[in-house]
Curated annotation (Swiss-Prot):
Domain notes from UniProt: The N-terminus consists of a long intrinsically disordered tail. The central part contains the coiled-coil multimerization domain (PMD). Forms a four-stranded coiled coil structure. The C-terminus constitutes the alpha-helical domain that binds to the nucleocapsid (N-RNA complex).
Stated role: Essential cofactor of the RNA polymerase L that plays a central role in the transcription and replication by forming the polymerase complex with RNA polymerase L and recruiting L to the genomic N-RNA template for RNA synthesis. Also plays a central role in the encapsidation of nascent RNA chains by forming the encapsidation complex with the nucleocapsid protein N (N-P complex). Acts as a chaperone for newly synthesized free N protein, so-called N0, allowing encapsidation of nascent RNA chains during replication.
Keywords carried by this UniProt record: Host cytoplasm, Phosphoprotein, Viral RNA replication
GO CC terms of this entry: host cell cytoplasm
Lineage, uppermost ranks: Viruses, Riboviria, Orthornavirae, Negarnaviricota, Haploviricotina
Pfam families with a match to the protein in the record: Paramyx_P_V_C (PF03210), Soyouz_module (PF14313)
Signal peptide: none
Localization of this protein: Host cytoplasm
Gene3D superfamilies per record: 1.20.5.300, DNA helicase RuvA subunit, C-terminal domain
Region (Disordered): 178-217
Name recorded for this polypeptide: Phosphoprotein
Main location: host cell
């Protein structure tokens, strides 16, 4: 942003005097009413001033004698006062700083006529004093940030463009004999040839400071962060793949659980059946040494009441029986004999006992002895006795 130009008080005085001299020069010249500009081409706001000034200046030219030439008399005194440029640090607190370019007093401009022949000097006020005030105000405010009073070239007009003709709004009231034309409302967007209209940017107020934040620190590890993010993305994809595989095998896990449940039920059934077998075929109790059981075995008398079954064997045993009068007598007179058993296929029972001996007997000599007995057995009772012996040896 370019720096604004600065001017001293003397330079401002010279510029103001030069502008006022230019205004005096153009206002003091005679104006031909017939060659003056038309009312329609004069900007609104100063039409009456320029019209009255032109008509007033045209009357002496047409009727009176030739006026003498005018010569501007420059006075050494300053017609206005410039605001004192007091340093800001010497002002009281919360005191606004005055603008040194704005005058404190604005006296009305004066016109001086000098007759060269007679040397008479006449003074009077300007006929177009309003126009002089307008030019003076423009000169005073052109070096400041304040917006000019004049409506010409306003920044609020979006169709304003430097170098082009200003587009003014339609006048609501009539001027003289001219009336308002209510015609087409379509306006040309360009007022100077083929150059398109460019909206002027709004002026920035000097009273609104710009808030500036500190610049962010430079990111020196951007590449490392990007590589880290890529690695995390790759790991996330791997985890997602594994999760998909786990979800795919969830059905297999459910099937395995169902099979385990059925196996547990089967094992429980087998345990119940084994318990039933132990109850039906009792043997030695558990957690009892075999030596103690063998010591407790001894011969005892057995009393049989009633007729004996065919499976009972009483060979080479002294028996005492009861006669008809219920008197005990030795068995020498009467011997109980076993009834012959019917022939039965014992192959399956022998194979079962051989497998039982192989599974339950750990010592090879004992195992061989039981296998020999099983093969030599011819009746079911012998096989049952061998079975009991195998179970006792296994405990």
């Amino acid at each position: 942003m370019a720096e604004e130009p600065t001017y001293t008080t003397e330079q401002v005085d010279e510029l103001i005097h030069a502008g006022l001299g230019t205004v005096d020069f153009f206002l003091s010249r005679p104006i031909d009413a017939q060659s003056s500009l038309g009312k329609g081409s004069i900007p609104p706001g100063v039409t009456a001033v320029l019209t009255s000034a032109a008509e007033t200046k045209s009357k002496p030219v047409a009727a009176g004698p030739v006026k003498p030439r005018r010569k501007k008399v420059i006075s050494n005194t300053t017609p206005y006062t410039i605001a004192d440029n007091i340093p800001p640090e010497k002002l009281p607190i919360n005191t606004p700083i005055p603008n040194p370019l704005l005058p404190l007093a604005r006296p009305h401009g004066k016109m001086t006529d000098i007759d060269i022949v007679t040397g008479n000097i006449t003074e009077g006020s300007y006929k177009g004093v309003e126009l002089a005030k307008l030019g003076k105000q423009t000169l005073l405010t052109r070096f400041t940030s304040n917006e000019p009073v004049s409506s010409a070239g306003s920044a609020q007009d979006p169709n304003f463009k430097r170098g082009g003709e200003l587009i003014e709004k339609e006048q609501e009231a009539t001027i003289g004999e001219n009336g308002v034309l209510h015609g087409s409302e379509i306006r040309s967007k360009s007022s100077s040839g083929v150059i398109p209209g460019v909206p002027q940017s709004r002026p920035q107020l000097a009273s609104s400071p710009a808030h500036a934040d500190p610049a962010p620190a430079s990111a020196e590890n951007v590449k490392e962060i990007i590589e880290l993010l890529k690695g995390l993305d790759l790991r996330l994809q791997t985890v997602e793949g594994k999760v998909d595989k786990i979800l795919a095998t969830s059905a297999t896990i459910i099937n395995l659980k169902n099979e385990m449940t059925s196996l547990k039920a089967s094992v429980a059934t087998m345990e119940g059946m084994i318990t039933t077998i132990k109850i039906m075929d009792p043997s030695t109790p558990t957690n009892v040494p075999v030596e103690e059981i063998r010591k407790s075995l001894h011969n005892v008398p057995v009393v049989i009441a009633g007729p004996t079954s065919g499976g009972f064997t009483a060979e080479q045993v002294i028996l005492i029986s009861m006669d008809e009068l219920a008197r005990p007598t030795l068995s020498s007179t009467k011997r109980i004999t076993r009834k012959p058993e019917s022939k039965k296929d014992l192959t399956g029972i022998k194979l079962t006992l051989m497998q039982l001996a192989n599974d339950c007997i750990s010592r090879p000599d004992t195992k061989t002895e039981f296998v020999t007995k099983i093969q030599a057995a011819t009746t079911e009772s012998q096989l049952n006795e061998i079975k009991r012996s195998i179970i006792r040896s296994a405990i």
